[in-house]
Amino acid sequence: MLELRLVQGSLLKKVLEAVKDLVNDANFDCSTTGFSLQAMDSSHVALVSLLLRSEGFEHYRCDRNLSMGMNLGNMSKMLKCAGNDDIITIKADDGSDTVTFMFESPTQDKIADFEMKLMDIDSEHLGIPDAEYHSIVRMPSGEFSRICKDLSSIGDTVVISVTKEGVKFSTAGDIGTANIVLRQNTTVDKPEDAIVIEMNEPVSLSFALRYMNSFTKATPLSETVTISLSSELPVVVEYKVAEMGYIRYYLAPKIEEEEDTKPE
């Protein structure tokens, strides 16, 4: 039997908005430690990893490890029926082929329940190795979102370079080029406005902007974003989910040859 009660129901709504455009169907895995999801996008270029730790829920009951296959578009439609202040409870019985979402208004004068059919989804669990990253950039998530959006109007690939001068985001397209440089800035009134750059080695990697823009759908979840870069490794773009977990997006860098053979 599974029963998870989340007082901040809006968090779950934001989590779904952050992953549903990247992944269509996925297994949510429940264990005693938390509620998690790990899935590749349909083109097998990006990976999303979500964890909501059990202690972040007001009530968390998971008698045995359970994997629930869901269509994220359908799940998002159901969660849109919840008010932003609603308390959301997720329930599933052992062996059942449905999951129930219950929405309670804070005043408890309205309770709605929605039942959704589960799916059988084959998914391989990918071991994500812990890696030492050459450069780690922590910056305001709204700023990162704005940079990705602005650069998308010029080109389709972003080059992220970290040097001792700072972090540079650049692109080139038919209409011209764009470079945006951010320098480390920790003398801010609010810690979430800081730009912190930890550079062990300089890096310069190219990524598809359409994926980066998709990752920025997680911006409402966190005021800061952490970007971890190493040559030869996928970039990790991480947003914290309140105090209870994270969403991490992994994206393989573009290889130089691919850029030379642009379709005519």
Curated annotation (Swiss-Prot):
Cellular component aspect of the GO annotation: nucleus
Domain of life from the UniProt record: Eukaryota
Portion annotated as DNA-binding: 61-80
Known partners and oligomeric status: Homo- and heterotrimer. Interacts with POLH, ATXR5 and ATXR6.
Subcellular location as annotated: Nucleus
PROSITE patterns: PCNA_1, PCNA_2
One term of GO molecular function: DNA binding
Family, similarity comment: Belongs to the PCNA family.
GO biological process: DNA replication; error-prone translesion synthesis; regulation of DNA replication
Protein name: Proliferating cell nuclear antigen 2
Pfam families: PCNA_C, PCNA_N
Matches recorded under Gene3D superfamilies: 3.70.10.10
Lineage: Eukaryota, Viridiplantae, Streptophyta, Embryophyta, Tracheophyta
CDD domains: PCNA
Alphabetically ordered keywords of this record: DNA replication, DNA-binding, Nucleus
Record function comment: This protein is an auxiliary protein of DNA polymerase delta and is involved in the control of eukaryotic DNA replication by increasing the polymerase's processibility during elongation of the leading strand. May be involved in UV resistance.
